[in-house]
């Protein structure tokens, strides 16, 4: 990327930030293109595909939210995060890059839930192996600062993370990070991940039903003993599935704390309608706890998070 293009993207983010400060909605993708054009960003010159503009907008919102004070009360936090997420237009374009890399970002209200389930302490090291535009990690920056490890293989999204000034940034295939010396030196206490559902870099366009489990296993191998991994994955990844069975056979010391589906409409704004689930996994824990809920919804989210805090002690 040239310095000129980087400067234009910077001014684009400044303009976006003004919208966020005023809580002004960007109503359509056409409006987003007009805003980019106002900053002299030209298609085919400064960006190749529209989704890059959306990625910048998403990264700008993530960075903005990372500097806000999220309400402590669970329902207030969810409403607060959802109100800002609605400022971006609904994303429906399925670009070749997004399909290949399975780049479907985590909605920030769900990201916040994943973080709560992780029970993160102030001295924990936290890894996000497929960080995208920083939807999850951005909500941790105020409290953890340089103890966040982000990895993103896509070059443009990796650049967006660099622009957000993370201290520990890598650009590697998340399905192989356990094999890399620089990652084996890391022993994260907590891992929060939203891996590709059905493709890996190796298989490219071909569907790989073990894609999610390969990413999961690679990250799990790095996890500290007694550590906790929070997984957002497609709903078909469940006990008895090929993917989970593969992980179970290769990670016999794991303990499944929670296994619950979430509302499929949650991902609507991010360009996919897949039904998803959240798994909370611990590595060889001293005390095995269990959160029995099979579904997460608006009615029980407070109960689940309170139970999680109580069990954590």
Question: What residue ranges belong to the model's regions?
Answer:
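Class I S-adenosyl-L-methionine
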Residues: 2-165
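Short, glycine/charged-enriched secondary-structure capping and boundary segments
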Residues: 141-143, 163-166, 184-185, 205-208, ...
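Conserved phosphate-coordination/catalytic loops
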Residues: 104-109, 206-213
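Conserved Class I SAM-dependent methyltransferase catalytic core
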Residues: 114, 208-268, 274-280
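Flexible, glycine-/basic-rich loop-and-beta segments that form/coincide
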Residues: 268-313
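Conserved beta-strand segments of alpha/beta enzyme cores
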Residues: 147, 167-170, 255-258
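Conserved proline-anchored active-site loop of SAM-dependent methyltransferases
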Residues: 111-142, 150-154, 172-206, 218-223, ...
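Structured loop/turn residues at beta-strand edges in well-structured enzyme cores
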Residues: 164, 181, 186, 254, ...
């Amino acid at each position: 990327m040239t310095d000129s293009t980087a400067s234009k993207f910077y001014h684009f983010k400044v303009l976006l930030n003004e919208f966020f400060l005023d809580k002004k909605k960007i109503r359509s993708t056409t409006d987003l293109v007009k805003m980019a054009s106002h900053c002299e960003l030209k298609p085919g010159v400064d960006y190749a595909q529209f989704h890059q503009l959306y990625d910048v907008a998403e990264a700008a919102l993530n960075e903005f939210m990372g500097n806000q004070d999220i309400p402590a009360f669970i329902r207030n936090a969810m409403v607060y995060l959802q109100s800002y997420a609605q400022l971006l237009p609904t994303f429906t374009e399925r670009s070749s890059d997004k399909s290949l890399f399975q780049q479907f970002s985590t909605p920030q209200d769900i990201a916040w839930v994943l973080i709560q389930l992780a029970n993160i302490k102030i001295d924990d090291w936290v890894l996000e192996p497929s960080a995208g535009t920083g939807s999850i990690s951005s909500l941790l920056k105020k409290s953890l600062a340089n103890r966040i490890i982000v990895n993103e293989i896509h070059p443009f999204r990796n650049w967006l993370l660099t622009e957000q000034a993370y201290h520990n940034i890598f650009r590697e295939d998340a399905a192989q990070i356990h094999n890399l010396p620089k990652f084996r030196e890391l022993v994260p206490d907590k891992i929060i991940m939203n891996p590709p559902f059905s493709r890996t870099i190796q298989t490219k366009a071909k569907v790989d039903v073990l894609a999610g489990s390969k990413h999961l296993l690679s990250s799990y191998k790095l996890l500290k003993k007694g550590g906790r991994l929070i997984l957002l994955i497609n709903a078909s990844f469940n006990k008895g599935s090929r993917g989970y069975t593969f992980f179970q056979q290769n990670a016999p010391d794991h303990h499944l704390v929670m296994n619950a589906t979430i509302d499929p409409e949650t991902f609507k704004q991010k360009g996919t309608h897949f039904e998803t689930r959240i798994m909370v996994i611990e590595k060889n824990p001293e005390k095995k706890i269990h959160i029995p809920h099979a579904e997460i919804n608006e009615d029980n989210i407070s109960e689940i998070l309170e139970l999680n805090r109580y069990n954590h002690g």
